[in-house]
Swiss-Prot record:
Keyword Cytoplasm in record: no
Name of the protein in its database record: Small ribosomal subunit protein bS20
UniProt keyword annotation of rRNA-binding present: yes
Basic residues biased stretches: 1-11
UniProt KW keywords: Ribonucleoprotein, Ribosomal protein, RNA-binding, rRNA-binding
GO terms for biological process, alphabetical: translation
Signal peptide range in chain numbering: none
Annotated family: Belongs to the bacterial ribosomal protein bS20 family.
Amino acid sequence: MAHHKSAIKRIKQNEKRNARNRHQKSTLKTYIKRVREAVESKDKEAAVAALQVAIPVIDKTATKGVIHKANASRSVSRLTKLVNTLG
């Protein structure tokens, strides 16, 4: 356990940030899962709608630094490609 006041404060800050980041990552995964489920059920309209909702969430998560911008770009690219396979 930390003994210095500043170290104790840092631990508290890190716990708060960790919880916030975990929540954002979990939300992100949920939106990505919705797109994949819509594609698996072969529902093009639902897949496109889910993708349009997921893309801003992915971008915002990258902007906040929770995931790397290349990771976000790759996710958007792969999901778009997946939705486009429905024709």
